[in-house]
Amino acid sequence: NRTGVVKSMTDGYGRKIDYMRISLTDNCNLRCSYCMPEGKISDIHYLTAETVLKCVESAVCLGITNFRLTGGEPLIYPDIEKLIAKMRNMSGVNFIGITTNGVFLSEKADVLKTAGTDSINVSLDTIDSDEFRKITGHSCLRNVIDGIDAALDSRIKLKINTVLRSEVDVLKMIEFANDKNIDIRFIELMPVGIGEKNDIIPRKAVIEKLEKKYGKVCGVSKMHDENGP
């Protein structure tokens, strides 16, 4: 916007759009059965830092102030901390989040915090090592848990994203998150594409299990302030 006047966008319900997700790469180091199963080859594609920064600059001119970096797996993006630092120095950028599988988080947490990362969402579907290997195709659960602990030590706001499937022990995931004082969000797998081949657990069954353990589940009056996983 050459005039310096910031425009804004609204959705069909009149709500202001101020949030953008940027997929830095479609490559990932894991092969989750509901996302990129074993045997599917992902070409290594990265958006250049220049492209990302131009995208952010243009988005800010449209009133976008909150950004989340995703993938694939964003922590395999070369020098992601340098990209985040440049984004943080851009006028109009208020929030930078990352969604990651957490495998490389223990070695990146401090530099991500220093660069200006506001929050990290860790995708974690189980804390059982055998189930983790079945879901992801890799035996690196310990790396993810160490990454979560490192992010907590760095005082980065943290949240766990868990995809609901029949294999997922919802109560154990809640206890894990509660023990570490982390928010957890359960994500429903849609029965389309790869999702048709996965054993989906109905939301009603999850609510019944939660109410049996914790009592009546209360609804929410408004959306959470982080705009999605």
Q: Residue locations for each model-derived region?
A:
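Eukaryotic N-terminal low-complexity, Ser/Thr- and Lys/Arg-rich leader segments
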Residues: 1-2
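Conserved alpha-helical substructure of the radical SAM core
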Residues: 5-95
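A short acidic, helix-capping loop that chelates divalent metal ions and anchors anionic groups
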Residues: 40-43, 128-135, 192-197
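Short histidine/acidic/glycine/proline-rich micro-motifs that form metal-
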Residues: 41, 74, 102-103, 164-167, ...
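Radical SAM/AdoMet-radical enzyme domain recognition
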Residues: 49-68, 77-183
